Amino acid sequence: MAIPVLICDDSSFARKQMARSLPEGWDVELSFACNGEEAIQAIKDGKGEILFLDLTMPVLDGFGTLAQIRKEDLNTMVIVVSGDIQPEAHAEVMGLGALDFIKKPASKDKIKEVLTRFGIL
């Protein structure tokens, strides 16, 4: 059965690049969101069991999205994928419940390693 995976990034290029970086043969049903508000709705609609989340976006950024997921106790596993590699950002997203933080651009090997480590793959 396909796993609902959501990629949330305001950049269409980054969304496509992330989709191409997912492991070969991983049975997923892929959805996309351009900002945190869209991501929250997609999760509520059952489209985001796993969420790859950017931090810097308009409308609702990644930090706000994580906070909203926690506040509403939404059922999703969040992996942050961002160019913002400041130690403070890393600590904040982990404190908000993210499984891990991957630096953009995300390599296939790194994504596979994170998914395997958390028993997702």
Residue ranges and their predicted role:
Residues 8-9, 33, 51:
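Conserved sequence signature across two-component system core domains
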Residues 12-31:
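Two-component/phosphorelay signaling modules centered on CheY-like receiver
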Residues 35-38, 61-64:
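Acidic catalytic/metal-coordinating carboxylates
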Residues 46-52:
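Active-site beta3 strand of CheY-like receiver
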Residues 57:
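Receiver (REC) domain active-site loop signature in two-component systems and cognate sites
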Residues 64, 85-100:
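Alpha4 helix (beta4-alpha4-beta5 surface) of REC/receiver domains from two-component response regulators
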Residues 106-116:
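C-terminal output helix
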